Amino acid sequence: MDIERVEQVRAVERLAHRRGLALMPRAGLAAADFVAARLPAGAQVLALAGPGNNGGDALVAATLLQARGYRVAVVMPAGPARLPDDARRAWQDWCAAGGQASADLPAHAPALVIDGLFGIGLARPLDGAWQGLIDQVNAWRVPVLALDVPSGLSAASGQPLGDPPGRPVRATWTLSFIGVPAALRAPGAAAWCGEQYLSLLGLTPAFLAEAVGPCGQATATAARRSGP
C-alpha cells in the first residue's frame, strides 16, 4: 500500500517504536547508500543536521559515509543540546567516530549537501537565521539530497512555509522514508524536491497496513484518486 499522508507516516513510526524497530539507523543507511551511488569515495560531503530526528538521520548518514572514505563535515546550527533520544545517540556515534560539528557553514562549497535540517513535522516559517543558511546553500548550486522533505517546504501542502512564503532548500533529490506525502507530488513542489525517491526502510506492506489500519488504507486510496 502507499503511504501518502504525514499522519500515516507517524502511525508507522509509532508502531515501529512499539515493536522495538529502530528506524533512524535504516534511514541513515538509505541516505548513505544513495550518496555513495552518486558520488565517488573521497569526495567532500556536508551534512546539515537540525534539532530533531531529521538531523539524526543526517548524522547516521554522515557517520557511515565517513567510514566509507568520504570527507564529511557536519553543520548543526542549533547544536546537540536538545536532540531527541534517537538523534542524540546518532550524535554520540558521530562523535565516537571522531566527528565534530560546526554551527556555521564552511567557506567553500562541498561536492554534495545532505539536508537534514527539518523533516515532515515542520509547520512554522523559518526564522531569519535558518533562512540565511538555506539561502547560502542554495547559492552554492551543488547537488543536494533532502531527507524526507526539503527544509522549509510544507509536507502537508507542498508549498513553502510562511506568509510571505519562505525559500526552502532547493533539492536535487528528495529521499522520503516510509511514504511520500501526496502534497510533495504537486507541480509546485517539484521545483523544490527535484527527483523524488522512496525508501520503505525494510518495512513490509503488511506492517504498513497494520500501522495505518483500514481507515488509513481507505484514505490513502482516496488521496491517490483525487490527488494532483
Swiss-Prot record:
Coiled-coil positions are none
Report which reactions are catalysed by this protein.
(6R)-NADHX = (6S)-NADHX; (6R)-NADPHX = (6S)-NADPHX
- Which keywords appear in this protein's UniProt record, sorted alphabetically? Isomerase, Metal-binding, NAD, NADP, Nucleotide-binding, Potassium
Q: Which InterPro entries match?
A: YjeF_N_dom, YjeF_N_dom_sf
Q: Which residues form the YjeF N-terminal domain?
A: 9-209
Binding locations of K(+): 54, 115, 151
Gene3D superfamilies, alphabetized: YjeF N-terminal domain
Task: Write the Enzyme Commission number(s) for this entry.
Answer: 5.1.99.6
Q: Does the keyword Isomerase apply?
A: yes
Recorded GO MF terms: metal ion binding; NAD(P)HX epimerase activity; nucleotide binding
Q: How does the cofactor attach, per the note?
A: Binds 1 potassium ion per subunit.
Which coenzyme or cofactor does it need? K(+)
Residue positions binding (6S)-NADPHX: 53-57, 119-125, 148
Function of the molecule: Catalyzes the epimerization of the S- and R-forms of NAD(P)HX, a damaged form of NAD(P)H that is a result of enzymatic or heat-dependent hydration. This is a prerequisite for the S-specific NAD(P)H-hydrate dehydratase to allow the repair of both epimers of NAD(P)HX.
Q: Record's family?
A: Belongs to the NnrE/AIBP family.
Protein name (Swiss-Prot/TrEMBL): NAD(P)H-hydrate epimerase
Q: Which organism is it from?
A: Bordetella pertussis (strain Tohama I / ATCC BAA-589 / NCTC 13251)
From the UniProt record, report the name of the gene that encodes this protein: nnrE
